[in-house]
A protein has these predicted regions:
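The feature marks the mature, well-folded catalytic cores of soluble enzymes
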Residues: 1-121
Length: 121
């Protein structure tokens, strides 16, 4: 969750609300980290994924906008599964595709929305 907001009182209100939503997520056993912007989020996520890890990602505007998807696919530091699976023949390699997508080391994606009570939409 990023805290991009106008300065002043509005920024404090946004920060307070983000902290409340993060607490609600935690109450559902979902780890939540509030960050200042997409670059900070990108750095944190990349810091959590060790080099060489298998990483699968869903289609995500957030991953694209933060540069995470490009980093995962093009840096050579990770084994990006999405492009690998896209290049496979579903008719002859369907079982292997399912196995790869079922248990990657890391799965990244995004949600459409998060409600104030910590529900993912």
């Amino acid at each position: 969750v990023t805290a991009d907001a106008p300065a002043g009182r509005d920024a404090r209100d946004v920060a307070r609300r983000l902290d409340e939503v993060a607490d609600a997520l935690r109450s559902h056993n979902i780890e939540a980290i509030v960050v200042g912007d997409g670059e900070e989020a990108r750095a944190i996520v990349l810091g959590l994924i060790p080099e060489g890890a298998e990483v699968h990602s869903g289609k995500s505007k957030t991953l694209e906008d933060t540069g995470l998807y490009t980093e995962l696919v093009e840096s050579g530091r990770y084994e990006a599964l999405r492009p690998r699976m896209a290049a496979m023949d579903r008719a002859t390699q369907g079982r292997e595709i399912r196995k790869l997508s079922a248990a990657p080391d890391f799965m990244l994606g995004s949600v459409a929305a998060i409600t104030a009570d910590g529900t993912l939409v």
